[in-house]
Amino acid sequence: MLVACGGNDKGAVQGDGWTFSPPAGVALDTVLMDDMEMNNPFIRYEREDDCYYMVGDGGYMWVSSNLRSWVGPYDVLCQDTASWIGAEPVITSPEIHKFGGKYYYMATFERPDVMVPDAEGRPFARRSCVALVADDIRGPYRTIDRGSSLLVESEMAAHPTFGVDHLGASYMIYTHQGEQNGDGTVQIVRFSDDLGRRVGEAYIMFSADENQWSGNVVDGERRFSPVMEAPFLFITDEKEMGILFTSYIGGEKAIGVAYTQTGEYGYNGPWTVEQQPLLTGGVGSASIFTDYDGTKVLVVGKVAVADGIVKCRPQLFKLDMQFDKLKIEGHYKF
């Protein structure tokens, strides 16, 4: 049931005898987008094979030729178990980015067997971010540097995304989580040329306490949420740089936006968080892809409760990015 897309069947076998196939003991399935259950969904459209690729929590890949029906799950990771990731990490919030002719699978890897302290000194499973590399979008994605943890080992980091500056240097943007520092922050660190190590130390772009719309009103007092997660970098047609992020309002997830004041490559800021959320109603983990006709599409995870069961499904929205700030035009029809 390998999806060819655009008449270009890449074949099931990639180099080293590795096979683009489902996890052991799991059969391939075809799932309609409306029935897909996935936390932290991320979609990438590849013009070379006219195909869509979706990844999410769990680390597996789904493939589609039309956005409506998806074939999967495929196991695309071949990480080095001797690295800090270990043999059985919990994988969340993956993204796939192309840079320098290669594909990079960036994700949060959690080690339930390794503890770090939270803000109160209580033990918390170690959680950090790393990039894996492949020559093909379908993998296999392999460890770049087994001896590098990339980020500070004691830091609870999650939700990595990718950026490039005007000199071609690459960066990881991620969150230092509020459970540990009490005020979640969006941070940036420069990659080495192969994206396997960091160059220098990370610095803060903006923090949860700058987000004035988040949190709850308790006893007449506004209590802001320390949650700041799922950053995603974008640039408008007017060359203004922004970052999507997720926080909470009234106990539900919502998506916000921050803009830099220094143009297309304004990583250093200053950053200003918009006074109102971009999207509310239990939505989070926003990202953007460009469709075959140039349409900019917002991908979010929509959380809903049915019969006491919490489910998250991908939702797509059409974006207008032609001015200095992005706007949602409505649900994306495909």
Regions found by a protein language model. Name each.
Residues 5-334:
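Carbohydrate-active catalytic/glycan-binding domains of CAZyme proteins
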